[in-house]
């Protein structure tokens, strides 16, 4: 009996060992051939864990005479193979595990032999296919504090205040750290602005980036990724600093970065009352809004209340500015096929400002000087949860839900000089709640991709306002009260509800391996309700309901120097507004873009499209809305929420690494048909505005960036030019009118990059803004000059920065000059 048990034990042990061995054995195999089907012998096949080919390799092999190869990696998960051979272009494909074959087709490259010889001065840039590699050490001088500071010194790269990165005028879609997608989309900007510069070893811009998902090969446009190479990140890293100053000034910040095999997170605590921004408009949009709020034609609809606007667009006249923020973003890779991420953000802001301005009254052709103080307090709390599941290699399911709350209070006290002699206090409170969710499914079917998307959004905003004044200027029934001389008041309570539900289904495929075709049908239903309660004006309710049904088709070629992207959306638009006739119409929104690549670093693109924008609910309402102590909005004549127009854009990039000259030119012209036109009835200093259709409105914007690095001495020169022209129609007391705004900005910066303890930079900027109202002799002309310089000194662990700045601005009525001197001493502590 014991012998039988022993035999059984041995058999079970062998089976277990065999099963474990079989489970652990993963084989990647296939053949490498050229376009004619001939075997490529002697090619090197490298195996990596991601599409960026981030070291270390998982394995490699040399192809045999018949072009075959076989690799047995030590670990599993997603894998990519790269084939390299002299005389052929490098080829990269996603690996398939046996019994499936990972075959690779390589293309002859006649230029490969000539590219072996490198001549000229070292530029710190290497262009290989769709990847631009930067030697960040070549461009930095050691005084950079964050990743953002380093990126801003790279040719062609720009970073916005919120941390959004652009390359050649195009937004970067994905942030990678050492080839890994570690962070949530909401936290990318925070990482860029807060990750220490000391950890950066290099940077790469990857054009035509693909993440290996089923839908990555069928997008309507190419995606761009930024890969930050580090010197090595610990599982938990970060920093904290705090400072204080005169008149109870404080500035504190902490940044925590956690990276692991499955879990990565970022946490930021930041606050100050010195005016340093910690929460920008871009941060607000990325956390409070989402891509789910999209109409059937692909347009994004974003609405921001007046109280939100006053909090997010921070003016220059703040005499008190406290801002605190706490964020937590985490991404967890539950398995090779399931990824979960979430984010949480809280922001508190408290500001106080003083303003003196000239108010224009066209009916009397006069200016009245107004002085005011404003207190603004606000809180935001948002949370998001998302999941990305790939049940098979051919399917991907994405889902996310986002919830947000806002609480904003605004108080203004003002007095007017001159003939008006008016003073008033205005208190406004805004409470907002919103929930948004979307789900998408991508499935590889046949020779293409089947995709289905759905979205849901709900918003509830409550605005309460109380205006007290010493004069009754508006044609409404004021209430009476004793409030320090302000004996009259107007109170209003607005509630806005929004519900949006949409869906889209379509199919994408690649034809002849060079043309991508995308066809879909979509629908979007939206309902906006505005309720008004007031003691002084008639209350009521307005409902605006829209339905869009679209058929969309787009095509683009993916190979060749000349690329064409063309398509159109045919949309049936139905809208109804309370008390007005419903409208049905059919519109076509075509788009065409052409781009030509003279080389990997030299390109020109043109795009032309018909556009659509949504009109704000308040500008379509039949209700009487009080906007200010002397302004009100009356019944609107707008009967459709859709405003159409035309957009024309040009983008030119020339990155000459040999001469180290980098030029980017971008221009855009937008024309709105039958523009939304304010019809102003003005009597003295009182205005009533109603909106109607008018002539077209134009907005022309042009920008040019030139960067030049001198080879004789380590100096870099950056020149930025920006021009803007805006023309919009209006009607004043029955007379057609046109308002124009002309803006010009120019800035030049010269910075040194010596390999020594001393460096510096000088800058000079000029700006001018001219606004002109055709029906009036009143014209505003504001010009300014800003000059500055910085001296950097570094020795060992000690860094010293001295700065000087001068700012000059003048108009027809005032002029100011500001001088600024700053000193900063930093001692870096190094633990052995």
Task: Describe the function of each predicted region.
Residues 30, 45, 63-71, 75-79, ...:
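Glycine-centered loop-to-beta-strand initiation motif
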Residues 29-41:
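Structural motif
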Residues 25, 35-37, 68, 89-96, ...:
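Membrane-proximal, glycine/serine-rich, low-complexity loop/turn segments characteristic
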Residues 50-56, 78-94:
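A short, solvent-exposed loop/turn motif at the edges and junctions
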Residues 52-68:
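Short, acidic Ser/Thr/Gly-rich low-complexity loop/linker segments typical of extracellular
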Residues 333-349, 378-411, 424-579, 597, ...:
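Face-selective signature of the C-terminal outer-membrane beta-barrel domain
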Residues 95, 216-218, 278-284, 306, ...:
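Outer-membrane beta-barrel translocator domains and adjoining extracellular loop/strand segments
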